[in-house]
From Swiss-Prot:
Biological process per Gene Ontology, one example term: mRNA processing
Summary of the tissues where the protein is detected: Specifically expressed in neuronal cells (at protein level). Expressed in adult nervous system and sensory organ tissues.
UniProt PTM: Phosphorylated.
Gene Ontology molecular function, alphabetical: identical protein binding; mRNA binding
A family per Pfam: SRRM_C
Protein name: Serine/arginine repetitive matrix protein 4
Biased composition (Basic residues): 107-123, 131-187, 214-228, 478-494, 556-573
Length: 608
């Protein structure tokens, strides 16, 4: 045992010698002995005894030796250093003689010297080596903890703070965008609202359908051009309501190829819808979110409800859509009728004409009618799908086309692709939409994907697209802008009780939308649409899809759609896409939004 221990000890000594030669060449056993003596006289004596009497204290010797090597390994460096610094002679004598007294003296001196170190280290341990141990551990731990905690704090805080900052930036940017849009559109919007409440009626009522159709056709042609172009994506996003209706005209005229499936859908119901659009879309493009369109929507809705058939549903959804933002809704309504047109070409056009007229005439009254109509419509329209769709389209203009379409019930997604854009979006967004109407589906898909991308984030671009791309028709553009931003609605909402709910929804939707926004293009967009749509619904009138997007969304809906449409599917109107995703997304939300929207819409009507 003793020999084994001695061999181990020698190995340790060699190791430590080699290690500390650089520091200070110690005598052969000075390090080990000094450390052992300084730390534990007993282990030191025991090793001695082990050397002298290996058989007597094997276990204790072993213990002592093990302790000594341990002490050596851990503290031999510090002790050796201290010993040398304090009293090399004493350390040497202690190591050679291994007298209990010298080591204590060296130990005391060490203590004295290391007591300062101890204090510095704040380690309560008596011996320097324990101090060192503790210090090392504690310092490491503290450092680690500090760094980790800092890292954790930073990481945890940074994501949160980043998120918060992002949210703030988003809010700020949105508010800025909305302000910008308001400023950009404000003239157009205030004019739009003027145009729409008065001009809505004047447009829809005052403007002869032919006039509206002519302007629409011109705009449609522009829009169809835009649609064909990439900018049309953005524009179609703004144009979701207008270009789609226009596309309907164009598609009726053979723009189908240019506008795609959406155009096809339009072409299907385009000729009948053209007339309705002449009005409904006119007020759609011009009226976008004005409550007059909403009111018109309600009247159309009541009519559609009276009809009860796909036409009825269409009018319902259309009413909701119109009511919702009436701008997109109506535009999409036309689209939807067109979309529906594919499904309900006959009923949808007739209904639409009627609905358009109905929408157009009951501007303010309809706001309330739409309100009452909106909720019942949501409930009435195919209970779940219609609700989701009705609500959806209520909340989102594009939604309305789907809801409006006889097939809206068929699929909330279909609701999403309520307009041409809607169709495209629905198509991409929801199989049901595709199944509803193959033609429609493809447009839906485009629209949807488009809308989804530009829905909220790109709302500014969409609005700009609307603004710059579609400035040609000033009244319409203004109406469209207003409908997009629904700035009056938005402003009202902020002041109005409905605004409270809408805003809450907005914040709620705001969070999901960023994640879901891309989703609308795919069927998964249903869920995204749900959350997004529900929030949108709350802003219902302002931005069917960006209703709640009150910030810039309300006016930026088209923009955001347009951006999205650019990103996703430049062919479709992002706006209807966005709306669509919204509409499908949340039936309950859409209902809530419908209510909230109704109140907002009536607010808008009253204000207008």
């Amino acid at each position: 045992m003793a020999s084994l221990q001695q061999g181990e000890k020698q190995l340790f000594e060699k190791f430590w010698k080699g290690t500390f030669k650089a520091v200070a060449t110690p005598r052969p056993e000075s390090i080990i002995v000094a450390s052992i003596t300084a730390r534990k006289p007993m282990p030191r004596t025991e090793p001695q005894s082990s050397l002298l009497l290996p058989d007597q204290d094997g276990p204790s010797e072993k213990l002592g030796q093990h302790l000594a090597p341990e002490a050596l390994g851990t503290n031999s460096w510090g002790r050796e250093k201290a010993c040398r610094e304090l009293d090399p002679a004493r350390a040497h004598s202690a190591s050679q003689d291994r007298d209990p007294t010298p080591p204590p003296s060296s130990r005391g001196k060490k203590k004295k010297k290391k007591s300062t170190r101890k204090k510095r280290r704040r380690s309560p341990s008596y011996s320097p080596s324990p101090v060192k141990k503790k210090k090392k551990k504690s310092s490491k731990k503290h450092k680690r903890h500090r760094s980790f905690s800092k890292k954790r704090r930073h990481s945890s805080c940074s994501p949160k703070s980043k998120r918060r900052e992002e949210k703030r930036h988003k809010k700020q940017s949105r508010s800025r965008k909305s302000h910008r849009h308001r400023h950009h559109r404000c003239p157009s919007r205030s004019q739009s609202s003027e145009l729409r409440s008065p001009s809505c009626e004047s447009r829809h009522r005052g403007r002869s359908p032919e006039e509206g159709r002519k302007s629409r056709r011109t705009h449609s042609r522009r829009c169809s051009k835009n649609h064909c172009k990439v900018s049309p994506d953005a524009r179609s996003s703004h144009l979701p309501s207008q270009p789609l209706p226009r596309l309907g005209f164009l598609s009726a005229r053979g723009v189908i190829t240019g506008s795609g499936s959406a155009a096809d859908l339009f072409s299907k119901s385009a000729s009948p819808l053209a007339a309705t659009r002449g009005r409904s879309q006119e007020y759609d493009s011009g009226n976008d979110t004005s409550s007059p369109p909403s009111t018109q929507t309600s009247s159309a809705r009541s009519r559609g409800q009276e009809k009860g058939s796909p036409g009825g549903d269409l009018s319902k959804s259309r009413d909701l859509n119109c009511g919702n933002t009436s701008d997109s809704g109506n535009s999409f309504t036309t689209s939807s009728p067109q979309n529906k047109g594919a499904v309900l070409e006959t009923v949808s056009p007739a209904c639409r004409s009627r609905e358009s007229r109905g929408f157009q005439s009951p501007c303010l009254q309809c706001a309330e009618v739409k309100k009452s109509s909106l909720v019942p419509s949501t409930a009435r329209s195919s209970p779940i799908k219609e609700c989701s769709r009705s609500s959806s389209y209520t909340s989102t203009r594009s939604s309305s086309p789907s809801s409006r379409s006889p097939n809206p019930r068929a699929s909330p997604r279909y609701t999403r692709s309520r307009s041409t854009s809607s169709e495209k979006r629905s198509y991409s967004r929801s199989p049901s939409y595709s199944s509803k109407s193959g033609k429609r589906s493809p447009p839906s898909r485009s629209s949807r994907s488009r809308r989804s991308p530009s829905y909220s984030r790109y709302s500014p671009s969409r609005e700009r697209d609307l603004k710059y791309g579609e400035k040609e028709p000033q009244p319409r553009e203004r109406a469209r802008r207003r409908r997009r931003s629904y700035s009056p609605m938005r402003k009202r909402r902020r002041d109005s009780p409905s605004h409270l709910e809408a805003r809450r929804i907005t914040s709620a939707r705001k969070r999901p939308i960023p994640y879901y926004r891309p989703s609308p293009s795919s069927s998964s967009s249903l869920s995204s649409a749900s959350s997004w749509y529900s929030s949108s619904s709350s802003s219902s009138s302002s931005s069917s899809r960006s209703p709640s997007r009150s910030y810039s969304r309300s006016r930026s809906p088209s923009r955001s759609h347009s951006s999205r449409s650019q990103t996703r599917s430049r062919t479709r109107t992002s706006r209807s896409s966005s709306s669509r995703s919204l509409s499908l997304g949340s039936r309950s939300r859409s209902r809530n939004r419908s209510l909230s929207y109704s109140s907002a819409e009536s607010y808008a009507s009253t204000r207008r």
